[in-house]
Amino acid sequence: MSSGYSSAPSVSHTSSDTDLNRIDSYDDGAEETTDEQRMCGLSELVTSCLTSSRLKAIDEEDEEENCNDIEIVGLSKTTTKVKRSKKVLSCPIVSSSTKKENGNAAPFLKSSQFTDVPPTIRFYTKGTKVTKPARKIQARLTWCHNSLLPIVMRQTLAASHFTVVDESLFYVGYWGRHLKSAQYRALQPHQKVNHFPGAFHIGRKDRLWMHIRKQQERFEGEFDIMPFTYILPTDRQELLKYLETDASRHVIVKPPASARGTGISVTRKPKDFPTTATLVAQHYIERPLTINRAKFDLRLYAYVPTFEPLRVYIYDQGLVRFASVPYSHSVSTISNKYMHLTNYSINKLAEADGVANKPVPKWTLHHLWEHFDEMGVDREKIQREIEEVIIKAFISTEKPIREHMSRFLEQEFICYELFGIDIILDEDYKPWLLEVNISPSLHSGTPLDVSVKAPLAKDVLNLAGVYVPPSFDKLSDADYSTRPRNGRKNREQLIKEASWVAAYKDQLGVIDNRIFKRLTPEDTRALVEFEDELERIGDFKLVFPTAHTSHYQKYFAETIYMNILLQQWQIAQEDDRSIGINRLEQLCRQKHMQSDQETSF
């Protein structure tokens, strides 16, 4: 074979969602295996025999209103345990739905593009009729109950036949509070959780600023993405000196780990800067952009499936949050929280407090872009600059997060995270990062919220790539070798990584397609995961890495092999993705991901 990357042979695919739909009509006892194999070459993970175990359900009304269509199992004073049967049955992936039902129902599974890579579960918004999987698979479609699990997420899970269960029971997924670091060690390969250990490095306002400040010192003038911030009480004297030089200066004081407007104030009074409590004080942007004379900020949503290699997606939709009363530069108004703060949790009370004669407005992000178009504003430039701010924020914090993960997480693929990014525009349309939230609220109190957050919940779960879990008796020895990124690196991989990182440094950040001459099993897993992920992207947009983001590599605290591999892959794939995809498919057909041997091309 030729050693050139561009000469990879073309391989046709027989796997498709149509194949999956066709399997949906098989009976529980069907012996047909050809279509299952053709579907996507399912691994032992989902083709293994299934036990006849069932979760014992109890009738319990959900603690949140409007969720009575979602069953919660095991929430009684006496914990309900999973009963296991010694009898093993042979059954297919999906249930014996009738052909008529399948014709009207959306598919339950999303096939991989690649042989021997299992499919992922499809998620939908409320009201979508979805093909039911086999009963014994549906028994394992369980999600951990948590008080932070929002209604739109519950409804999305219910549409795909998931049951919400007590945390003491077997569960596949978790969406809730950030876990304690040590809890990540107990997670199993079949589980998915919505946080990374160490995410506080970007979610805490003090940590985020510390990391951005380091980047400002390394790259002067290139990381002015966040208003200057003081960490109190350490920086108290520096803050007082800043305020003394100009009587019009103010700062926004916030607790470092709060959300939804808790504990926020705009001030310049020394008494508001305690000498003991930990707070952050951020330069106040005195000339913000206003719409209809009101100050506003943006809530955007960023999704990160992995920090090695770092990948960042931004959701196409978002929220625009307004202050309740017209903005004024007057110092005398500085204490008016309804004028200077844009948190919806604060401003929704303005009408009841008598300071506004109507409910505070809220726009979608699309509404804002339409407004800019009508005003003749270059909104594409603003969007590019916002993307740059978000990318730089994640690059600033990725090293400490990776280091924290390495201590507490054996398999990175079990984690994913949705971040709430708060951005404000000044009067020159420059975007400024205010903070990053690691648990952005998906609770939806208005139809506008539902229109944004319900599709978001669905797209997040699809992008996360939730697999059908193995049977209860197979959990300890399930074969995850065909899953992307199994967390292990052999000597061959380590040697290749070290040599290419050294070459990258020697060539001053230049890399070429020779990095693809030999793809190791670990390389293949990472690229297969990425290509399948792009097939589930929904309304997210990949902003890093792309074919045009190689200039960001210099900002990383250290050169990571997987980052440069994926960056170069994006450059090589720009004109024709099918070439690389066909090569990966050939490797999958050769069971390369299960091999410890390197394949030469």
From Swiss-Prot:
Species whose genome carries this gene: Caenorhabditis elegans
Loss of function: phenotype: RNAi-mediated knockdown at the L1 or L4 larval stages causes a defect in egg-laying.
One GO biological process term: microtubule cytoskeleton organization
PANTHER family, per database record: TUBULIN MONOGLUTAMYLASE TTLL4, TUBULIN POLYGLUTAMYLASE
Keywords carried by this UniProt record: ATP-binding, Ligase, Magnesium, Metal-binding, Nucleotide-binding
UniProt binding sites for ATP: K254, R260, G261, Q282, H283, Y284, I285, K295, F296, D297, T342, N343
Domain TTL span(s) in chain numbering: 138-476
Residues given in the record as a protein binding sites: R260
Protein name per the record: Tubulin polyglutamylase ttll-4
